[in-house]
Amino acid sequence: ETMPSFKHSLILSSLKDSYILGFDHWYKRYYSFYHPHDECLKEHMSTRAIEILKHIYGEGKFSTNYDLHLPVDVEDKIKEFIGDTRIVIINPLGAKKICRLTFEQIKVIYQEVKTHFENYRIIFTGLPQDLLTIPILEIETLPFDEFIYTVALTKYSDFVISVDTALVHIAAAYHKPTLAFYPNSRTPEYPSHLIWSPNHHKSIQIVSPTYTVKDIDTETLTNSVKRLSCIDKK
């Protein structure tokens, strides 16, 4: 759903590879082979990986499971940070405006988590400057700035609540029970909430009735947190 970019064109035209497989119709002329998979896409984006593997190896069964590498020192720091505590991650403010919960919604989710996840440690993740704006006293955040530490925290967490699809898919890589809030798609021709859905059986996906997550009502928020608490709770 991105518009063509001259800068992107320059990057593609400067590639020295002898063969380029591409999916974006805006840049057809820069590819050795254009694949129409993404045209009128109505299924999860992971199916694109299958098409790439088919193109290279021919027909067959392929795994599209996520595989994330973590540096040992990063994992060690996170394990020391969390100790033997049980963790619920809340990621309430995404990079896009349409993926940012209101402060009232954040408070509702936070209170519900405290109610249904007693004795769990609640850690907020996101951009440091965004987390500073949340009007909840003494919320806990990571003491590390690099995103790789959030990835490691996700690996060692117990539950994840997120508006950020990147974190949703990281949680899926580690098979973490996840509550994911999505804006509705702007057009039926590109059902983004389906294409970029959690793609994991331990995930609960809540799709807003509008193009922004701020319109998800309080009852839906509270019920969804309650549902999350029933998944693999220790």
Predicted regions, residues:
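Catalytic machinery of carbohydrate-active enzymes
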Residues: 1-234
